[in-house]
Every structure is written in C-alpha cells, then in structure tokens.
Curated annotation (Swiss-Prot):
Protein name: F420-non-reducing hydrogenase vhc subunit A
Cofactor(s) essential for the protein: Ni(2+)
The keyword Oxidoreductase is annotated on this UniProt entry: yes
A GO molecular-function annotation: nickel cation binding
Signal peptide: none
Binding site for Ni(2+): C61, C64, C445, C448
Keyword entries, A-Z: Metal-binding, Nickel, Oxidoreductase
Subunit details: The F420-non-reducing hydrogenase vhc is composed of three subunits; VhcA, VhcD and VhcG.
Disulfide bond entries: none
SUPFAM superfamilies, per the entry: HydB/Nqo4-like (SSF56762)
Length: 474
C-alpha cells in the first residue's frame, strides 16, 4: 500500500494533515483529514467556579476568542438566571460583530485569497500572501485596515484586543464612554465602504473559479444549520434553524435544546469529534454544515440593507440552498459587510453609552445548568455547563463550529481525490492544493475544535505543578 500526505495543511488555524492511501494496484483507497493536536479545555474547566468560564474559554483560540467569551458569558447568565441590561447586550453584540470583521478580513485577505487568485499554480512560492500582494496590494491593505477596526473595538469594549474580559455574569464590567465612542466612530468611518469594496473584489475572484472548473471542488449536498432571529441572519442571538439539502426547514429550536437534535461521536484517526443530526445518517443526511454559507442558507434575509442587496444577488445566482464549499468565501464577504453595517448602527445609537450595564446578581440563585450560544465566525458555537449548588463546574460540553464541519471537510477531500487523483503519479502540487482549498473554504479553527481523545481507550494525564511540586493531576 502507498500513502501520500499533505502535512501540514497550511493557512489554517491549528495543525492538521490529509492522508491518501492507495491499494497495491495503485488505485485510490481512502482519504482522511486528520487533526493532530489535542487541547482538553472541557476537562480543564472541571472544578472551576462557573463565573470564571468567560475568562478561561477565550484562551481556546486567539482568533475567535470573543465568540468563546460571549458564549460562556451567556451560559453563566443562565446558570444564575439573570437577564442583562439592554446596553450590556448591545456592547456584547458590538464586540461580536467587530470580532467577525476581524476574522473574516483576516481569512479572506491572508488565508483564502492565494487560493482564489492562484488556484491552478504549482509554485507554492507564488501561491501565498506575498504573491497576492504583488497582484493586488490594495486588497491586502483593505483587509488589514478592517481587521484593525475590529480589533480596536474589541480592545475598547472588551478590555483587551485578545482574550477580552468585560462580559461577566449579569452584563458588562464597564460601560463605553462618550470619548471612546467618538474615537470608534471616527476609526470606523470608512468601514462599510471598505467592506463593500472587498466584497466586490472577492466576488469576482470566486466567480472566476467557474472558468477553471473549480467551483464544485468538494461538492456534496447536506443539511445546513445556523442562528436566525425572526428569520433574519443573526450571529449573536436567536433560535437554531436547520434546513435540509433542498432548503426545507427541518428544525428550529432553542439552543438550550441542542442535545435533542445533535449527536457526537469520535473516529480513531482524528482528535476532532464527528457530529451528525440525530436520526439522520449517511453522506449528505446525518452530516450538516455551519459557517457563513450555511447561515445564508438558513436565513430569510440579512439584517442590514446593503448586505441584503448582495444576499439577493447571491441567491439569484447560486440558488438556495447553495452547497459549493467555494461559496463559503462569497458568503463570508457578504457577512463581513453586514457586520460592518451593524457596527456603525450600534455606535450611532446613544444607548450604547448608557451606564446601566450590569444587572444585580444573587449568588445563591444557582440553577445548576446553563447553555450559551452565538455564531462564531466559523459557525454555531454552544457552551454548556453544569454545576453543583456552589457554582463549581462539574461537567462541560463545548460544541464548536469546526467540529460540526469536520464530516464535511472529510467528505470534501475525499471528493477532490476521487475526481483528480486516481493514482499517486497524478498528484501534482496544485492538485493536492485543491484538497487544502476545500479545507480552507470552511476556515477551520483546529485549536478550538480539539477537545476529545480518540475512539479507543486512551489516557491523557496532565500534571499541574507549582514550585516544582505536583499539586494536581487531571
């Protein structure tokens, strides 16, 4: 048996690889996407006070840390049965939209654009950020500028640009001042214009894939899942909606009920869990997808006017639901524009500087369980905590976006290999890159996703030491 591997998969957050196995006759036997790191945050959180969760979970990732911060904060609010003030909710939503801008601008400008600009190039020295900069430096500058706006908002509202700290039980630890708002309004003055310009550049790049017969890389039909708020796309709050491969609504439920609809499993070749819809099995049946394209597939409309115009154009061109992985890029840019519009809307609302940002919390009012849900840049994110009557965590389940897309990435690389790589001899660099293109379209965050140990019984021991002495073993 012959094996080929792509290791590491580049331009993704975290560490992964793809292996291709060929039988003794040289024919393709199987293809798998492996994630080769383990984090274990679900175990780390056991024994911690529940109010500490929003501080610990952002450390899962340095890119989508705001999403983890807010999902945990929402869950903690539910553990204490508290409803946060309107302004606190607005501030949380603001930094979530800002983080979305940061992440989407980073992914398109730095990670995805080489695939879209040089999809058939064998030369890896050209198929990278420097190659893109040589062709369109203005696009790179725009991506950096948008990312700066997003990160600055997170820093001002969240206390830190990386790993924010202000979302606490009952609301926010501090309000936004008038001076800070004025500064952010000035900083974001051209944000919507820049996002729309980037969308038009990216839209053309994605559409050019049709000419190279690459639009259907990794294509398969599946269910799609995402949050909707009265039918509109919403990355901060709402119900979870699931549509089938034909676009029919199968389920719409409160995030707290997720365990009634989603099942989790493991496979021996990856540290990522594999998720599927309960009572649905098989390729394109049990498998479902999340992330930007899925959010467009499940919603009825966008929440902002300019993004709505592009959403309508997208649906008219590609139909609904659209299943092509390459369209995640296009959808990501529509969402980048929507988040930019919402940032301006929040900052222009005088309620954003109200000082009533924290509700009174009764420390004895512990319900023992809480679920928090947001749409992270990469898809639906659920934090589920259970506690004892003292508020100490005794069980944690993190349903992370990339985990939910894991079956899709596995199927996607298999589809590419079946079409382009019949034998090892034809595995040219740009052909192998086509498999990476499918993975990167989902913008996976592998650090976020790895929190399970494989299928066979294994023991991972973590030794916590202080002053050279062992104080705890996990």
């Amino acid at each position: 048996m012959t094996k080929l591997s792509i290791e590491p998969v580049t331009r993704v957050e975290g560490h992964g690889k793809v292996t291709l196995s060929f039988d003794d006759s040289g024919k393709l036997d199987k293809v798998n996407f492996h994630v080769v790191e383990v984090r274990g945050f679900e175990k780390f959180l056991e024994g911690r006070y529940i109010e500490d969760a929003p501080i610990f979970t952002p450390r899962i990732c340095g890119i989508c840390q705001v999403s983890h911060h807010l999902a945990s904060a929402k869950a903690v609010d539910n553990v204490f049965g508290v409803k946060i003030p309107e302004t606190a909710n607005m501030l949380r939503n603001l930094i979530h939209q800002a983080s979305n801008v940061h992440s989407h601008a980073l992914h398109f400008g730095m990670l995805a654009s080489p695939d879209l600009m040089f999809p058939t190039t064998d030369d890896a020295l050209k198929r990278n950020l420097l190659g893109v900069a040589g062709e369109n430096m203005d696009m790179i500058k725009d991506s950096i500028a948008m990312r700066k706006v997003g990160q600055t908002i997170v820093q001002k509202v969240g206390g830190r640009a990386i790993h924010p700290v202000t979302a606490i039980v009952g609301g926010q630890s501090k309000p936004l001042t008038e001076e800070e708002r004025d500064e952010l309004l000035t900083l974001s003055d051209n944000l919507v214009e820049t996002a729309e310009r980037t969308l038009n550049v990216g839209k053309e790049m994605v559409e050019n894939l049709k000419e190279k017969d690459l639009m259907n890389l990794g294509y398969f039909e599946s269910y799609h899942m995402g949050l909707v708020n009265n039918g509109a796309q919403d990355i901060y709050e709402g119900n979870i909606r699931v549509v089938n491969s034909e676009g029919k609504i199968e389920y719409e439920f409160d995030p707290a009920e997720y365990a009634n609809y989603i099942t989790e499993g493991v496979r021996p070749y990856s540290y990522l869990k594999f998720l599927a819809l309960l009572k649905r099995r098989g390729e394109g049946k049990g498998a479902y997808r999340v992330n930007t394209l899925s959010r467009l597939n499940v919603c009825d409309k966008m929440p902002t006017p300019i993004a709505q115009k592009y959403y309508e154009e997208f649906v008219k061109t590609y139909g609904k639901p659209a299943h092509q992985p390459m369209l995640f890029h296009y959808a990501r840019l529509i969402e980048l524009l929507s988040s930019s519009e919402l940032i301006r809307k929040f900052l222009e609302d005088d309620k954003i500087v109200d000082t009533d940002v924290r509700a009174e919390v009764d420390p004895k009012n512990i319900t023992g369980e809480g679920v928090g849900c947001v749409e992270a840049p990469r898809g639906t994110l659920i934090h589920h905590f259970k506690t004892d009557d003292r508020g100490i965590i005794n069980d944690t389940n993190l349903v992370v976006a990339t985990v939910q897309n894991n079956p899709a990435m596995d199927i996607g690389v298999q589809k590419v290999a079946e079409k382009y790589i019949k034998t090892p001899e034809v595995a040219k660099p740009h052909i192998l890159n086509h498999m990476e293109m499918v993975i990167r379209a989902y913008d996976p965050c592998l650090s976020c996703a790895t929190h399970t140990i494989g299928e066979e019984p294994k023991i991972l021991s973590i030794h916590v030491c202080q002053g050279g002495k062992l104080i705890k073993t996990l």
